[in-house]
Design a protein with these regions (language model features):
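Thiamine diphosphate
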Residues: 17-166
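Active-site or pore-adjacent capping/gating segments
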Residues: 1-18
Length: 166
């Protein structure tokens, strides 16, 4: 097959950068969005704005980080099982649905493989997907989307596609 033939003809990897060469995106986003103004953050964070520098649970800190990402990147989407109105099983996404609407924070079907496949497809179409898998045990059902699809995309497409997932 073509893929096998190409793999056997390539020089052996000698350093870590050789391994990464084919998956580094050819077109890195030139214009990184500017950070949101403090006035806007103050409005969006509401009563939590004054708590940002105080100790908090990891769940709350991740929620703050997601809020900042959603403010900075208008192409960011959060989705998974019960992440919208419910705010996720650990309330990581609490309040994000109300701030950013169903267009950017939405529930997915109860199918982890589809969630990660959807994330990969969205990333290839210019979005910054933030998928949530509720529990590690559920991730194992879907890990092939990362290991077998996303991680090998550049190689199997003859470098026509790169892996834009984070």
């Amino acid at each position: 097959s073509y893929v096998f033939d190409q793999a056997t003809l390539k020089p052996k990897f000698e350093k870590a950068s050789d391994v990464m060469t084919s998956i580094i995106p050819k077109n890195i986003r030139a214009n990184v969005p500017v950070l949101p103004k403090e006035d806007k953050r103050k409005i969006v964070f509401g009563k939590d704005y004054n708590r940002l520098s105080k100790p908090a649970s990891m769940a709350k800190l991740i929620n703050y980080a997601l809020l900042d990402i959603m403010l900075q990147y208008d192409n960011a989407l959060i989705f998974g099982e019960d992440v919208a109105k419910k705010g996720g099983v650990y309330h990581i996404t609490a309040g994000l649905y109300e701030q950013f609407s169903i267009r950017r924070v939405f529930n997915s079907p109860l199918d982890e493989t589809s969630i990660l496949g959807f994330a990969s497809g969205l990333a290839h179409n210019g979005f910054l997907p933030i998928p949530e898998i509720q529990f590690l045990a559920y991730f194992h059902n879907a890990e092939d989307q990362l290991r077998g699809e996303a991680a090998t995309l550049s190689f199997f497409s003859k470098s026509q596609y790169t892996n834009p997932m984070i």
